[in-house]
Design a protein with these regions (language model features):
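Sec-dependent bacterial lipoprotein signal peptides
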Residues: 1-18
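Structural recognition of beta-strand segments within beta-rich domains
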Residues: 62-89
């Protein structure tokens, strides 16, 4: 297994974790569900069925603070692996997702509310094929709209996640994810690594 380094996953994880420390108490969130907004949980989309090895640099903004991370992602048709490091090179989290089951290890210094499913959900919303994401979101009452330069996730006609893309395609581009429901944003620089 290759060692991974990139920022999107860990930053999303930390930011979603900060946001999910006080979720709507009326819903129970499963380990394989991602929290899009307070009270809105969706099952994780399945792996895309493709082979991807990508490195990401992530800068996240939450409540006046800035966080930076690195992550490396490896996906095969049946599995998704991620390793996230903080800017000191410390391993923050390792995630293995196979057959709808997620195994992970996390550093003790991560906030308690940091959830790998939220991190993977943000990765899917930004980088996975439109139809895969749209189908997963529809199952929980959310919709995905593609714009000329990004994506918008809506729940009850309210924007809960906005994604804007810069140059490039697929895993080889910069993206900016904003989640006004939880008050965070993530700037991602992603590059696919030749296999």
């Amino acid at each position: 297994m290759k060692i991974f380094s990139g920022l999107l996953p860990l930053t999303a994880l930390v930011l979603c974790g900060c946001a999910t420390q006080a979720p709507n108490a009326s819903i129970a969130i499963q380990d394989n569900e991602t929290l899009l907004a307070p009270g809105v949980a969706c099952a994780m989309p399945p792996p895309t069925g493709s082979n991807v090895n990508a490195a990401q640099t992530i800068v996240a903004h939450f409540r006046g603070q800035t966080y930076s991370f690195e992550a490396q992602i490896q996906e095969t048709p049946d599995e998704f692996d991620l390793v996230a490091l903080d800017n000191l090179g410390r391993r923050a989290m390792s995630v293995k997702w196979r057959g709808g089951h997620m195994d992970y290890s996390r550093a003790d210094w991560l906030p308690v509310g940091v959830r790998p499913a939220d991190m993977l959900g943000d990765i899917a919303i930004v980088f996975w094929p439109t139809d895969t994401v749209r189908t997963a979101l529809a199952a929980c009452g959310a919709t995905l709209i593609e714009t000329s330069n990004g994506r918008v996730v809506k729940v009850h006609n309210r924007n809960v996640i906005d994604v804007a893309y810069e140059h490039g395609e697929g895993w080889n581009r910069a993206a900016h994810l904003r989640n006004p429901a939880f008050g965070f944003s993530i700037d991602i620089q992603s590059a696919e690594i030749a296999q």
